[in-house]
UniProtKB/Swiss-Prot annotation:
Gene Ontology molecular function: DNA binding; general transcription initiation factor activity
Phenotype seen when the gene is deleted: RNAi-mediated knockdown causes early embryonic defects, including premature cell division of the Ea and Ep blastomeres, a failure to undergo gastrulation, and embryonic arrest. Knockdown causes severe loss of polymerase II large subunit ama-1 phosphorylation. Knockdown also causes a reduction in expression levels of several embryonic genes.
CDD domains: TLF
Name this protein carries in UniProt: TATA box-binding protein-like 1
Lineage: Eukaryota, Metazoa, Ecdysozoa, Nematoda, Chromadorea
Record's subcellular location: Nucleus
Domain of life: Eukaryota
Gene: tlf-1
Function: May be a general transcription factor. Plays an essential role for RNA polymerase II/ama-1 transcription in early embryos whereby it activates a subset of RNA polymerase II promoters and facilitates the reestablishment of transcription after mitosis.
A Gene Ontology cellular-component term: nucleus
Keywords noted in UniProt: DNA-binding, Nucleus, Transcription, Transcription regulation
Length: 508
């Protein structure tokens, strides 16, 4: 902390502008309880003339002769309270731990020093900077040794003569600075007095005091640019032209797209054929079931069910003579199964000598599937043909197409798979697929085409779980009654003895 104090000597006031930290005396010591300061720099002298004006002169730095254990702001305490003061006059020494000059005695401003009080601050600054250099230069030239005070007095006289000879130009920057300092001097004097009067503040009070002081504003000229780039500007990127292929909108059809390669004829597979007919006789189902193998007879429903291996199908026979055949893979297999079961009924019922004919033979349903070599945009098909098609993605993944002539129902999937149901014959299946092919070809899509990749993949059977050898369990017979079990509604265990409860009196 730097502070300043002053001492009045006659009509002159001494200022110590640069002081060190305040060192309060300790209680119980030889030094009285007062705040003292240590001088470390120059002294400024203020002189009052007859007109009431103040003149300031800056004296060179030096060491003032002080008294030991003095009291008041004019004296300096260099050691803690209770210890003797160090004499620093006339020999090398320190003031508050700093090296000081020796052999110089500061006197009150008298005689010619009073005249120096009327000099401008520019002369005082020159004296402060040059006095010691002149004194050392004269001694080095081998001239007569003079004291430091005499050299200082001679230098002041030379500067005074140069000052009277040179004209005063207040436009000079150095003189403008002097005028600014003279205007600021009363404010500095007020701040110094305020610091002398106030006692030592606590750390919290000092923080508040500094926070209240306004921060100095820095004036930046207009020509000065503080936005200094941290690095050199990078060159501007060169635009690169990227060619984007023309993509047709989603709403357009795929008729203008590149046609997909022809993989050959479309393979249509018949999965199921359902037919029925009637025999002109009453059939005894119990007798027929007793003379037929691989059958199931349900007397309550009045039906006999038979599973035929060649051709593979499933047959239902009613006592009224109606026969239903399900599961054949072609119409030819369905006719062959119908003739076979009719001949077997004729033999069992003893009608071999009579003519039994098949009446009302009809194919009810043909189920067929086929796979197209491209994908289909079924949402666009449903939008273009709302009367023939029905598409409900929340209910089913496929589009339902209802054909009137020939009568059939088709289920079309996005993968290109088509399922035909409700056809009356294989010819109807071929006809309805021939009609639907140009429609789905218009809405094909390449990204959904899978080709024969899915067809080439074989379904892998799940590997059986490796289990240990089967555990053979004993049969419940008379030989293992004693192990455990239930006999005559009584539960017993093999480790129980027959006379276990004989010794207990249960009536008590």
């Amino acid at each position: 902390m730097q502070m300043g104090d002053h001492q009045m000597m006659g009509n002159q006031r001494y200022y110590r502008t640069y002081v060190q930290k305040v060192m309060p005396a300790q209680a119980g010591g030889a030094v009285s309880q007062n705040a003292t300061y240590v001088q470390t720099a120059g002294i400024r002298t203020v002189h009052h003339d007859g007109n009431g004006q103040q003149r300031i002169v800056q004296l060179p730095p030096g060491v003032r002769q002080i008294q030991q254990n003095g009291v008041g702001p004019a004296y300096v305490r260099q050691v803690p309270g209770g210890q003797p003061m160090q004499v620093n006059f006339g020999h090398p020494g320190t003031i508050a731990g700093r090296n000081v000059a020796v052999g110089v005695q500061m006197r009150p401003v008298q005689g010619h020093n009073v005249q120096q009080g009327y000099q401008r601050q520019q002369v005082a600054n020159q004296i402060q900077q040059q006095n010691r250099a002149v004194f050392m230069a004269q001694n080095q030239q081998g001239q007569q040794q003079i004291s430091y005070a005499q050299a200082q007095h001679r230098q002041q006289q030379q500067n005074q003569q140069q000052h009277h000879q040179q004209p005063q130009h207040f436009n000079h920057p150095s003189q403008q600075n002097q005028m600014i300092m003279q205007h600021r001097q009363p404010q500095m004097h007020h701040n110094q007095q305020h610091q002398m009067v106030q006692p030592q503040m606590t750390r919290h009070q000092m923080a508040q005091h500094h926070a209240q002081q306004p921060h100095p504003q820095i004036y930046v000229p207009r020509d000065m640019n503080l936005a200094v780039p941290l690095r050199e500007p990078s060159p501007e990127p060169i635009p690169v032209k990227i060619e984007v292929p023309d993509v047709p909108p989603e709403g357009t059809s795929a008729a203008n797209e590149e046609p997909m390669p022809d993989d050959g004829d479309i393979d249509i597979q018949i999965r199921n054929v359902v037919c029925n007919y009637t025999l002109p006789l009453h059939i005894d189902l119990r007798k027929l079931a007793m003379n037929t193998h691989n059958v199931t007879y349900e007397r309550e429903k009045g039906v006999m069910m038979k599973q035929k291996r060649s051709p593979g199908c499933y047959i239902k026979v009613y006592s009224s003579g109606k026969v239903y055949i399900v599961g054949c893979r072609s119409e030819a297999d369905c006719k062959r199964a119908a003739r076979s079961i009719a001949r077997h009924v004729q033999r069992v019922m003893g009608k071999t000598k009579e003519r039994v004919s098949i009446r009302n033979y009809r194919v009810n349903n043909v189920l067929a599937t086929c796979r197209l070599p491209f994908g289909i945009k079924i949402e666009e098909v449903a939008a273009k043909y709302p009367s023939e098609s029905t598409y409900e993605p929340e209910l089913s993944v496929g589009l339902v197409w209802r054909s009137v002539t020939p009568k059939a129902t088709l289920r079309i999937h996005t993968t290109g798979s088509i399922t035909v149901t409700g056809a009356q014959s294989e010819a109807d299946v071929l006809e309805v697929l021939s009609k639907i092919y140009p429609i789905v070809l218009e809405f094909r899509c390449l990204e959904r085409a899978k080709g024969n990749v899915a067809a080439q993949k074989k379904r892998k059977r799940k590997a059986p779980v490796n289990r240990g050898p089967p555990i053979k369990r004993e049969r419940f017979d008379d030989s293992n009654y004693r192990n455990s079990g239930v006999i005559n509604n009584q539960v017993y265990f093999s480790d129980e003895d027959e006379d276990l409860y004989d010794e207990l009196d249960l009536e008590e």
